[in-house]
Amino acid sequence: MAAAFDREKALEHAIAQIERAHGKGSLMRLGDEARAPIDVIPTGSIALDVALGIGGLPRGRIVEIYGPESSGKTTLALHAVANAQRAGGIAAFIDAEHALDPEYAKKLGVDTDNLLVSQPDTGEQALEIADTLIRSGAIDVVVIDSVAALVPRAEIEGEMGDSHVGLQARLMSQALRKITGALSHSGTTAIFINQLREKVGVFFGSPETTTGGKALKFYASIRLDVRRIDTIKEGQEAIGNRTRVKVVKNKCASPFRQAEFDILYNVGISREGSLIDMGVEHGIIRKSGAWYTYEGDQLGQGKENARNFLRENPDLADEIEKKIKEKLGIGPRVDAPIDLTVVER
């Protein structure tokens, strides 16, 4: 009994010593306080928010969005930026590809006047800028577009054709080790957009892999695989893409869920299209033949007409969205203000 008392006393003394050296809360018992709910930034697609299991992209974590070219990766990231800004947050976009279109970003709802943008010359510069912004505690979301464009300084300064094996992977590994802890303390969401490459000589399994080595796969709490699966047409004219996102990795909820939604050209993710799809799936909107109805009121014949009707009647769209979210138990409206001040800065 005395030995147990002495051990407890020694432990309390050790905890007090650790807190004096490293600050209060640096060591605690897991059961001392109730775990706070995960704060999120909505993605812009209610279907994807549901697939993520927590209602959006988690704050204070690393998110990787990858897929083939023109699949909607940057569009998805910009919608997250727009939602963070709409809630009063500050966003940064590190444009390593030097390809950000401000006009397109504005159409998606991004406040381009207040968006912090950097077009770095090297991978080291890009990641140092990201690290400084994250450690400031003032940024809600930072997007790095893309990992493939984070070219190490040695490669840029070297000759064309020089071998630089593993330089980018080492750079990413070092940077992620540094920023992971800072993200947790600042509550910043770091979104890394990544490209696909093919592994040579793979006969079994998928030959596809992402750039930048394996570090990002380990450090990311969420990994989203974005694919374009169909073209949306109005008559003979293509007006958008049908997109499928698979949650390949999820440390916050169950992984391997999928979401499908429409991305319309010069519009972005179709909120109304997602509401129609989810409403029909969960019995809130009735589909009879080509007609869509809600509580006896006709929304339109065909999905495009129903989409236009909801766009012209935002109050009705809000009502449908509220019912879907209440039924599924997920967070606030995708384009409504959300509280981004939960994490102390």
Swiss-Prot record:
It is found in: Cytoplasm. One of its GO terms (cellular component) is cytosol. Keywords: ATP-binding, Cytoplasm, DNA damage, DNA recombination, DNA repair, DNA-binding, Nucleotide-binding, SOS response. ATP binds at residues 67-74. GO terms for molecular function: ATP binding; ATP hydrolysis activity; ATP-dependent DNA damage sensor activity; damaged DNA binding; single-stranded DNA binding. It comes from the Bacteria. Pfam families: RecA (PF00154), RecA_C (PF21096). The keyword Cytoplasm applies. GO terms for biological process: DNA recombination; DNA repair; SOS response. PROSITE patterns: RECA_1 (PS00321), RECA_2 (PS50162), RECA_3 (PS50163). Its main location: cytoplasm. Belongs to the RecA family. Can catalyze the hydrolysis of ATP in the presence of single-stranded DNA, the ATP-dependent uptake of single-stranded DNA by duplex DNA, and the ATP-dependent hybridization of homologous single-stranded DNAs. It interacts with LexA causing its activation and leading to its autocatalytic cleavage. This is Protein RecA. The gene is recA.
